[in-house]
Amino acid sequence: MGIQDARWPSEDEETHLLDSSSAEQTRGEKCSDSTPDVHIVEEYEDRAPATCQAPSTSTDTPVLSSSMICPPRQRVAHKCTQCGKCFIYRYELLEHQRLHTGENPYRCSQCGKAFRRTSDLSSHRRTQCIKAAYICIKCGNSFQSIQEKFRHQCVHSVQKFDCSQCGKSFKKMHLLGKHELTHTQNRIFTCRQCGKVYPGMSELRSHQKIHPPELSNQCMQCGKFFSSSACLTAHEVRHRQQRTQICARCGKAFKNKHDLNLHMRSHTGERPFQCTYCGKRFSVSGNLNIHVRTHTGEKPYLCSDCGKAFISAGELQIHRRTHTGEKPYKCSVCGRGFTMASKVTLHMRVHTGERPYVCSECGKGFSRGSELKKHSMNHTGVRPYACQLCAKTYTCLNHLKRHLKTHSVIQNQSV
């Protein structure tokens, strides 16, 4: 089945269009009868426009428009002739007017459902339309699951390189060359720890990650372990590389001025990059790009073993360790291995007794910020997790789950 949408929204369009009508109401408010259909709105620092003020929202997370993030000197306000609401951008007015006309120009080619906005269609295809969620955008083939879609190799118009000895095909010439070595070379690579044999060094190294590393090959500066002393020596060279840029506040050294400036934001609190969906700010643009994917649902990094998708390469790398068994970060006290460096830091507090997160109300200390957050709810009275069956509330999700089991037990006893 082919994709037949007359117009598929681009990423730029989805970035401009908001996903909820509440954002539309935040931008536009009724103007007075004397207000012309198009007029100039002056914007100044620390106050809203004089002619069209955006009403405040009662939610904790405000919806921020692009004009609030980077306010220009002047904006042209566009007024709806039917209800009097004003909008800064013309595309916002056109989108709003579809509420009056009932027009839904964006139609899903798989199920026929129509939508008023491109972002609604995009969200529908990602999360609701079963037929559209598993379609190859290159060839139009549909699949029953995301795993089948991932395993599907779309080879249309892709040049293939065939092995002359066994007929196996490859997409790239260097992959074919690497494969042909398995026919011409008699050399094999054996794991010294378990005796398994592999045709190439890369396959052997990938296998060796499942074995616990030798304790003698540990970097004294960062704690990482290596399979050989040669790898450890090469790694230690990176620590000894000249770092001339020194932070005046904490003494940390960096290779160049750019890295130092990025680091300084951790001291100054500067976060110049803001999310247009929820208003959250970031010190690095790359972190913002990854965060935006939590709103758009984009997960471009796929695991080649199970097909699971992730929003960043870092998350995929950590997930891959569940398949390989690799735990490169070791505790220097007890030798326990971890898949992430941050988990080692948290674990070390078990040995040191460090509790850096202190409650401002009672002075109690905690090793994790999440534990302090849960504890603070006892002082504030906030209990965000409510049971839908008996209206009991809890400060912790696990406590709610444990409570819900009591309902299932009572129901089974009554039967």
Swiss-Prot record:
GO terms for molecular function: DNA-binding transcription factor activity; RNA polymerase II cis-regulatory region sequence-specific DNA binding; zinc ion binding. One of its GO terms (biological process) is regulation of transcription by RNA polymerase II. Keywords: DNA-binding, Metal-binding, Nucleus, Repeat, Zinc, Zinc-finger. One of its GO terms (cellular component) is nucleus. InterPro entries: Ikaros_C2H2-ZF (IPR050589), Znf_C2H2_sf (IPR036236), Znf_C2H2_type (IPR013087). It comes from the Eukaryota. SUPFAM superfamilies: beta-beta-alpha zinc fingers. A zinc finger (C2H2-type) spans 78-100, 106-129, 134-156, 161-183, 189-211, 217-239, 245-267, 273-295, 301-323, 329-351, 357-379, 385-407. SMART domains: ZnF_C2H2. This is Zinc finger protein ZFMSA12A. It comes from Micropterus salmoides (Largemouth bass).
